Structure formats: C-alpha cells, structure tokens
Amino acid sequence: MLSFATLRGRISTVDAAKAAPPPSPLAPIDLTDHSQVAGVMNLAARIGDILLSSGTSNSDTKVQVRAVTSAYGLYYTHVDITLNTITIFTNIGVERKMPVNVFHVVGKLDTNFSKLSEVDRLIRSIQAGATPPEVAEKILDELEQSPASYGFPVALLGWAMMGGAVAVLLGGGWQVSLIAFITAFTIIATTSFLGKKGLPTFFQNVVGGFIATLPASIAYSLALQFGLEIKPSQIIASGIVVLLAGLTLVQSLQDGITGAPVTASARFFETLLFTGGIVAGVGLGIQLSEILHVMLPAMESAAAPNYSSTFARIIAGGVTAAAFAVGCYAEWSSVIIAGLTALMGSAFYYLFVVYLGPVSAAAIAATAVGFTGGLLARRFLIPPLIVAIAGITPMLPGLAIYRGMYATLNDQTLMGFTNIAVALATASSLAAGVVLGEWIARRLRRPPRFNPYRAFTKANEFSFQEEAEQNQRRQRKRPKTNQRFGNKR
C-alpha cells in the first residue's frame, strides 16, 4: 500500500513534524521516572541546539523539538526559545503531578550544513519510531564530535571560488575573477584563523572588509602600469558578498514573520552590527589606500542592465550558490540542488525582472528561489534552509555597500546614504522574498494535520478544578463506606 507521502510527494522534516503524530502511543521510556523524562528532554534540547546554531528559525526548531519529545511519549511539553537558550517543561505522574524542566544554552552560529543534514535524518528516524533514546543519544554524541564531511581546505576553496564567481556576476573578466578568488581565499583563511584565536566576529568582519579593499587598490595601480583595465569595485564587492553570505538576515526576518519578535530583534541587530564591521573595514581600506597614494578610481554610475553578458552571469550565479554550499560543508546532494536553484533564480532575475529596479527585482527573484528551492529540497529530502540561503547569495548587495562607503568617504554623503539604504532594502527584500517562497512551497507540500493523541496531552495537564473534583469524589465515598459497614454490624 502506498503511503501518503508517496502519493503526494516527499515532504520536509518540519512539515512531517507539524502534521503527523508519533507512530504509536506506547512510550519507550518510563514516564514516571524523572531521570528518563529529563534525559529525553535534554536529547531534544541538544537537537534544537544544532538546528538553531545552523540558522533554523525559532518556530521550526520548536516544532522539531516537540516532535522528538512526542515520539518518546512526552506529548505534553512546553518549548520556549530565545536566541541562545532552549527551555523545555512538562509534568509527570498520574495523581501527583511533578514538574520537570530542562534548560539548554545554544552555541554560537555555525554554518555547518553537514550537521544540519545529519540531524534532519536523525529527527526523521526518531519520529518514525526506529531509534530508541539510547541509540539517538549515541548518534548525537558522535555527530557533535565528528568533523565535517570534508576538510577545511575544501571549504576554503569553495569560498575562494565563490569570490571569483561573484566577480563574474558583477561583470568582471578573468583577471578580476582571479584577483577576487585570491582575495576571498585570503579573507576566509585570515578570519578563520582569528576566530580560532577567539577574536569576536565583529572585528573579524572589520579585518575581512579591510582585506577586501587594499588588494583591489594595489591590483588597480599595477594594472594601470601594465596597460590593463580592471574595476576594483568588482573585486571589493565580491569580498563584501563573501563576508555577507554567512549572516543571519534571512533567519531574523523569518523569526519576525513567524511570531518570535525577541529572537528576530536580536538576530537582526546582530546582522546589522556585523555588517557595520564590514563597512568599517572597507572604510579603513579606502583611507589607507589614499594615505599610501594607491588611489581608487572614482565610482562610475550604475550601468543600465543589458543582455550582453546575461548567460555568463546566470552561470556565475549557479556557481556562486554551489561554492557557498561547499564553503558551509554541505553534502554534495545539497550542493547540486543549491546550484540548480540559484541557476534558475539567476535566469529569472536577469531575463525577466532586472529592469524593475534592485529592490523589487530582488524580492520577486528571491520569492521564486524560495519556492523552487523549497520544492526541490522536499523532493530530495534536503533541509530547505540550505537551499534558501545559498539560493539568494548571488543577489546580495555587495556593490551597493561599496558604493555607499566610497561616496560617504568622498564627501558625497547623500549618495552614500542612498546606496547604503538601497543595500539594506535589497537585503531585506531578499530575505522576505525567500521566506515567502518557502512558505508557498510548504503550503503546497504540507500534508493535512492528524493528531489522534490529544487525550494524552490533556491527561498531563494539571488542573485545580480536576483536583477539587477528585477531592470531592473522595469525600463522598467515605461516608457511604462507613454506612455500609454500620449496616453490616
């Protein structure tokens, strides 16, 4: 007999968690044992830690944490998440309810998509009833300690390839692409080294923005001496996009839209702060270039869109997303799907909506990316977050940020703030569009809700009214018992 998922198409883990109950009401743990219940809740919190630190939204993490606890018989749990903390609460016992709480601190953001895919498969296995708690705990221990699916050198090459592809995306030739490749390689290698030494992310972004600027100005001066023509703005913008790609703007807007304003505000402020570090680093690089008399050329006005290099830009868009996925340690199936999604999104952007302006075009194209990527991710059982973030990476406004910073430092304040505002609006449009597209894909592929175990949830709730009614019933039984014994006498 064909299953519902086979008839309708494959669904994502979070869709299955929202729609389907655990396979059986028989709990694999002793629900009256405080330690076993707390162990299951701690297991669910650790899974939520990996989801949150990988960039999963607040609401989706709650659903999947609750799915894990329900699969082990804890149908009544409250899950509260605020940015870097997870709190889970439940009651155990029959007549005497005993509260159980688990509090877990979430680690910092770590874009390791291989762990996200592994924990996604673990949740599916738990929800299907195929993994008991002790096996799930062992798998989770191995997952937390195991390295990525491939080493850091491969990821570093992915980031470097992404920088070169973004340069082509911005209209640069092979010389510009090669310099952007080397610049991105240097940025990620340096910031990763500083991160291991404990330097805060803000200062890492300052260093990254500085590295993105100074080599471009030196390369421009050398190119003039040899009679070559390059645009340093394309090199700098590609470095900015590499730094912007790992930020959490998409997740912050998704949290705000789905009803988690505290987490959304914190993530949005964090994104603005880290973006400010990039801008500060670019500004330092521009000023140092002037001090060293390695002058950058005046900014040209933004060129009107044309079809002369559309094919190259579409290909570069797909390569950018695939390279970003490699840089985030995604599995190869995820890399391929992310590249195909960005390829279709770039084609849609440059062939149909580029003339609508940067903000509107970004919003429409991101919606198409979120929708297409959401369907493909569900078809191939990949977390939709990976495809969504990678799919909009080619459209990040690195060039607008550089234009704004350059104009501001050259006494063109109005033009500078205008470009910064356009960059912020474009980034917000990308995030909002991809969230909307993924929501549409979820609505099309989501199975109907089915929850036959509501009575279990009701049974675990403590009610003063029920307690009072039980006491009244006990008191009514006592005199009847005494009277019956009196008649026997």
UniProtKB/Swiss-Prot annotation:
Observed phenotype of the null mutant: Mutant shows increased threonine peptide sensitivity. Mutant still exports L-threonine, but at a reduced rate.
Topological type in the membrane: Multi-pass membrane protein
Subcellular location: Cell membrane
Origin species: Corynebacterium glutamicum (Brevibacterium saccharolyticum)
Residue ranges of the TM segments: 151-171, 174-194, 206-226, 233-253, 268-288, 314-334, 335-355, 356-376, 381-401, 420-440
One of the GO BP terms on file: succinate transport
Name of protein: Threonine/serine exporter
Functional description taken from the UniProt entry: Catalyzes the export of L-threonine and L-serine from the cell to the extracellular environment. Export is dependent on the proton motive force.
Compositionally biased residues, Basic residues: 473-489
GO CC annotation: plasma membrane
Main localisation: membrane
Activity modulation comment: Transport is inhibited by the proton ionophore carbonyl cyanide m-chlorophenylhydrazone (CCCP).
MF term (GO), any: transmembrane transporter activity
Similarity section: Belongs to the ThrE exporter (TC 2.A.79) family.
UniProt keyword Transmembrane helix, yes or no: yes
Catalytic reactions of this protein: L-threonine(in) + H(+)(out) = L-threonine(out) + H(+)(in)
Pfam families: ThrE, ThrE_2
